[in-house]
Amino acid sequence: MPVVTMKQLLEAGVHFGHRTRRWNPKMAPYIYTERKGIYIIDLQKTQQLLEEAYYFVREKASEGATILFVGTKKQAQGVIKAEAERCGAFYVNNRWLGGLLTNFKTIRSRIDKLIELEEMEQSGKLEELPKKEQSRIRRVLEKLRKNLGGLKEMRRLPDIIYIVDPRKEKIAVAEANKLGIPIVAIVDTNCDPDPIDYVIPGNDDAIRSIKLITSVIADAYLEGREGAPLTAEKEETESAEETSEEVTEDINLEELEEEEEV
């Protein structure tokens, strides 16, 4: 039985690509036809490739692998957060910070700062500070939560990255490629499929399409984790502790507050 039916794909509008004037010729093998100026994606290929991605993620998860969900476009933000939290994945749904993977040591220090400030807030220590300082810290805290809130438990680089719209998330794609981290992605007709290890041809603009495909990947990760051996979990914990000890660079509030938007 397929992990997703043709009926589900059709009802979610997964087959609708972009207008013919906005396309990448490398996506030609995944296009079925053109209708009223819009490319129609071959759902048989989508079904087959989604299944391949599903089994890849499930197998890796059963070995203790971690996965990072990435989708910062408006249509993807809510789905990415909900599905990542459901399956226990890390996620980025607001803005990809340059160097998140290639300079993870520095990013991890910012995550640690987020955790530190949240502990101050929860313990009541923040309320003991002068009002002006409280306001400044809360601004920093809100910014950190938006950008790094889905990464608090990520103590090392992820083993897999799942991306909605690799064209928009080109920096994430480049960083993952540089580090040899396999990418699973929804690839629309205007995207370049070459940098993607597991291409899922599909509509990356419709919420229903994004939700259907993302839920399949989340299911795969969840099912794999449930059967993951304890030894893999133990190794991950030990690796996390080693990575945590390596982080020495301190990021102060002023630097965080003044950080330029990408």
UniProtKB/Swiss-Prot annotation:
Record-linked CDD domains: RPS2
Name of the protein this chain belongs to: Small ribosomal subunit protein uS2
Any single Gene Ontology cellular-component annotation: cytosolic small ribosomal subunit
Location of region: Disordered: 226-262
Residue spans of biased composition, Acidic residues class: 235-262
Record-stated family: Belongs to the universal ribosomal protein uS2 family.
Source organism of the structure: Thermotoga maritima (strain ATCC 43589 / DSM 3109 / JCM 10099 / NBRC 100826 / MSB8)
GO biological process, one term: translation
Annotated TM spans: none
Pfam family membership, one: Ribosomal_S2
GO MF: structural constituent of ribosome
Domain of life: Bacteria
Keyword list, A-Z: Ribonucleoprotein, Ribosomal protein
